[in-house]
Amino acid sequence: MKAIRIAIDGPASSGKSTVAKIIAKNLGYTYLDTGAMYRCATYIALKNNYSENDISAILKELSEHPITFKKADDGSQLVFLGTEDVTLAIRQNDVTNNVSWVSAIAEIREELVAQQRRIAQDGAIIMDGRDIGTVVLPDAELKIFLIASVDERAERRYRENLEKGIDSDFETLKEEIAARDFKDSHREVSPLKAADDAIVFDTTGVTIQGVVQFIQEKAEKIIDMS
């Protein structure tokens, strides 16, 4: 039975990470949150007041403080920059609102994509992000592109923020998500788009379990055929 690679792409708050984690657990696969890696680079930039002109400094920080993922006692994923636990810090609004310009820097994408490919080379992995199926794993056995309405995605982000104790305004979240959609889909480097061979699935009004079932059935069919 072959260990496959699953790529899940889509815009902000389309449900990628939530379903990817569940499917990875169900299949016994490794889950890699590539978005967290770009958030780490953004956190570095904001913490040090770096701009687009400080690319080498950001890369140096990433080299000196490598990104690693660990499991908490409750099974949740922790994100570290060197020895610093940045799991919550990289989910703050200032990071969310700045990650687009950092992730648009070609040199940073090249470095993080190289790391992601090294991790995925043995298969049995599920990755979610913006360009997994188009750039990071163009030969992935299963590619999914999730979409959802701006209203639904803002509602999801609002609930997530409440659970994490982050103050947010629903209308502001809608504006921020729409703005990020535009930035992500219009950037010169690795713009947000579905791979030609990706399965596009609209999650608006669909439960998390419904999305998980849809993707997992596709994955299991490919695994059984391998």
Swiss-Prot record:
HAMAP family: Cytidyl_kinase_type1. Its EC number is 2.7.4.25. Belongs to the cytidylate kinase family. Type 1 subfamily. InterPro entries: Cytidylate_kin, Cytidylate_kinase_dom, P-loop_NTPase. One of its GO terms (molecular function) is ATP binding. Keywords: ATP-binding, Cytoplasm, Kinase, Nucleotide-binding, Transferase. Its main location: cytoplasm. One of its GO terms (cellular component) is cytosol. The gene is cmk. ATP binds at G10, P11, A12, S13, S14, G15, K16, S17, T18. One of its GO terms (biological process) is nucleobase-containing small molecule interconversion. The keyword Cytoplasm applies. It comes from the Bacteria. Coiled coil: none annotated. This is Cytidylate kinase. It holds the Pfam family Cytidylate_kin. It catalyses: CMP + ATP = CDP + ADP; dCMP + ATP = dCDP + ADP. It is found in: Cytoplasm.
